[in-house]
């Protein structure tokens, strides 16, 4: 099915609207903070934090209410700074089994937005390093409200559609060439009559 360029670009641009650190690490019994940044326009949307390698089965641990009011559940808290377009997730009293893959996400009508964050918990007494800088290398699109399909949807569906769209545009431009103006028709003179007269004389 052919999609209008505006709709296609809107769909593809969604996966670049949020980014966070590729990984964070902290010591056992300590705490860690994850900051996820989003683009303008998503300030009043619900932000969430879920756990699990696969997002179609990941468990939502906490989420905002679309405001800047902080929320806390057990050892996890979340707060959205809409002015800076950053929401912060804090995990306290870390245990070894807290090490896992997590997701920063924004709930919206249609595909949710999100980015993967790997949490590493070092054994007690081990040295820890700071969180890596934000990256968009692991961005993905989530399908549904917390019911998300695999990110390969982006690679195998949307990218080919974009390529088909570009090919169609190039083909249309090639087929809509400006027709050349008709040239002047050559003038033919009838020399048969004078030639006949000359031969008769």
From Swiss-Prot:
Subunit structure, briefly? Answer: Interacts with TYROBP, which enhances cell surface expression and activation properties. Interacts with GRB2 in the presence of FYN.
User: Found in which tissues?
Assistant: Expressed exclusively in myeloid lineages.
Q: Which CDD domains match?
A: IgV_pIgR_like
Identify the stretch annotated as signal peptide in this record: 1-17
Which cysteines share a disulfide bond? Answer: 36-104
Give the modified residues of type Phosphotyrosine: 188
Q: Which residues cross the membrane?
A: 152-172
Family membership? Belongs to the CD300 family.
Modification after translation is described as: Phosphorylation on Tyr-188 by FYN is required for interaction with GRB2.
Descriptive protein name? CMRF35-like molecule 7
Question: Which keywords belong to this entry?
Answer: Cell membrane, Disulfide bond, Immunity, Immunoglobulin domain, Membrane, Phosphoprotein, Receptor, Signal, Transmembrane, Transmembrane helix
Q: Can you give the residue ranges of the Ig-like V-type domain?
A: 18-120
Q: Which residues lie on this side of the membrane: Extracellular?
A: 18-151
The organism of origin for this protein: Homo sapiens
Q: Recorded GO terms, molecular function? A: identical protein binding; transmembrane signaling receptor activity
Query: What does the entry give for GO biological process?
Result: immune response-activating signaling pathway
Impact when changing residue 158 to L: Abolishes interaction with TYROBP, and strongly reduces activation properties
Primary residence: membrane
State the protein's purpose.
Acts as an activating immune receptor through its interaction with ITAM-bearing adapter TYROBP, and also independently by recruitment of GRB2.
Family annotation (Gene3D superfamilies): Immunoglobulins
Give the record's GO CC terms. plasma membrane
Which membrane topology describes this protein? Single-pass type I membrane protein
- Localization (cell): Cell membrane
| Highest taxon of the lineage | Eukaryota
Q: Which gene encodes it?
A: CD300LB
Residues assigned to the Cytoplasmic compartment are: 173-201
Q: Where is this site: Interaction with TYROBP?
A: 158
């Amino acid at each position: 099915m052919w999609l209008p360029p505006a709709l296609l670009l809107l769909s593809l641009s969604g996966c670049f609207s949020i980014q966070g650190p590729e990984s964070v690490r902290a010591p056992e019994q300590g705490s860690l903070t994850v900051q996820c940044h989003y683009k303008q326009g998503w300030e009043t949307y619900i932000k969430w934090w879920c756990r699990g390698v696969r997002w179609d089965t990941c468990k939502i641990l906490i989420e905002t209410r679309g405001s800047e009011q902080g929320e806390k559940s057990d050892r996890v808290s979340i707060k959205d700074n809409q002015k800076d377009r950053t929401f912060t997730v804090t995990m306290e009293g870390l245990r070894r089994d807290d090490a896992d893959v997590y997701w920063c996400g924004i709930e919206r009508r249609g595909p949710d937005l999100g980015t993967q964050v790997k949490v590493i918990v070092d054994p007690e007494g081990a040295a820890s390093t700071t969180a890596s800088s934000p990256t968009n290398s692991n961005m993905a699109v989530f399908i549904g409200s917390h019911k998300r399909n695999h990110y390969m949807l982006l690679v195998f569906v949307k990218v080919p559609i974009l390529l088909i769209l570009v090919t169609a545009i190039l083909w249309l431009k090639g087929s809509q060439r400006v027709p050349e103006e008709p040239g002047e028709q050559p003038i033919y003179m009838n020399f048969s009559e004078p030639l006949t007269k000359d031969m008769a004389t």
